[in-house]
């Protein structure tokens, strides 16, 4: 039985994770898991893991690394007591030779003993603080996926990984822009402050109503488009690298961790028991 978005907005973390794990909820996670850090995923063979870690280190705005699994272990114990990467994301993209091969709600059959999981912080995390400040976010209010765009900003390459930065966009009233920028700056594990705001052409974006991922979001009177570095950036780099196998979250469909949204270090206390 499916579970609706509005119900999950007020559910506990345990209820939310159970709905995702069972397949009862397969949609976006914006506005869900209030108080907890959300994460983008990149899962790739160990042979490419060090180069990918270098890529994240060299590009911390779009790739804020919050967790790395042990090789072959799908249990991300540093991010949560019982997180199983194979089932605990609403939707996954499976790439083969750099091409999107399938979209799945469960990657148990795709799992291999040589895979390493990288978790990267997500801007959905700071959205709760923005909304608590009284700034409405159109995609959350309308049950849509935040719009994401390929920008003209080059990332720093590492090994086979390279490409343009992807950015997410939120429309904000002009008199609240500086405030929203400062709110998000307090969440460096979730991309931090915006990389740009104003005319989208400055990022090489021709039409904000034609996003590369997610849903188009209208720009209302007196609103300014604000752009944050986005964790879909690694997916662009992975496509360019043409790895034989790579699995990511479907854009907008995140892993919700047990880590507090304002944590300085993205490791839950229960991880100490696993040493």
Curated annotation (Swiss-Prot):
It holds the Pfam family D-Glu_cyclase. Coiled coil: none annotated. SUPFAM superfamilies: PSTPO5379-like. Its EC number is 4.2.1.-. InterPro entries: D-Glu_cyclase, Putative_hydro-lyase, UPF0317. This is Putative hydro-lyase SPO1111. The keyword Lyase applies. Keywords: Lyase.
């Amino acid at each position: 039985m499916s579970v609706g978005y509005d119900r999950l907005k007020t559910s506990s973390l345990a209820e939310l994770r159970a709905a995702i794990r069972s397949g009862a909820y397969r949609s976006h996670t914006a506005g869900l898991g209030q108080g907890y850090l959300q994460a983008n995923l990149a899962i790739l063979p160990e042979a490419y893991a060090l180069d990918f870690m270098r890529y994240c280190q060299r590009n911390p705005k779009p790739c804020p690394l919050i967790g790395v699994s042990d090789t072959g272990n799908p249990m991300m114990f540093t991010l949560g007591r019982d997180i199983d990467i194979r089932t605990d994301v609403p939707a996954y993209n499976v790439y083969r030779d750099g091409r999107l091969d399938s979209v799945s709600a469960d990657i148990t059959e795709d799992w291999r003993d040589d895979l390493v999981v990288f978790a990267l912080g997500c801007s959905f995390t700071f959205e709760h603080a923005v909304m608590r400040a009284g700034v409405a976010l159109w995609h959350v209010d309308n049950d849509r996926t935040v719009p994401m765009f390929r920008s003209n900003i080059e990332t720093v390459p590492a090994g086979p990984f390279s490409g343009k930065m992807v950015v997410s966009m939120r429309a904000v009233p002009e008199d609240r822009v500086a405030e929203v920028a400062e709110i998000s700056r307090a969440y460096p594990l979730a991309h931090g402050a915006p990389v740009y705001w104003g005319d989208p052409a400055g990022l090489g974006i021709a039409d904000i109503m034609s996003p590369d991922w997610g849903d188009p979001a209208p720009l209302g009177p007196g609103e300014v488009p604000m752009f944050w570095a986005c964790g879909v950036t690694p997916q662009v780099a992975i496509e360019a690298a043409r790895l034989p196998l790579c699995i990511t979250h479907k854009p907008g469909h995140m892993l919700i961790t047990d880590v507090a949204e304002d944590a300085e270090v993205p490791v839950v206390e229960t991880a100490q028991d696993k040493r």
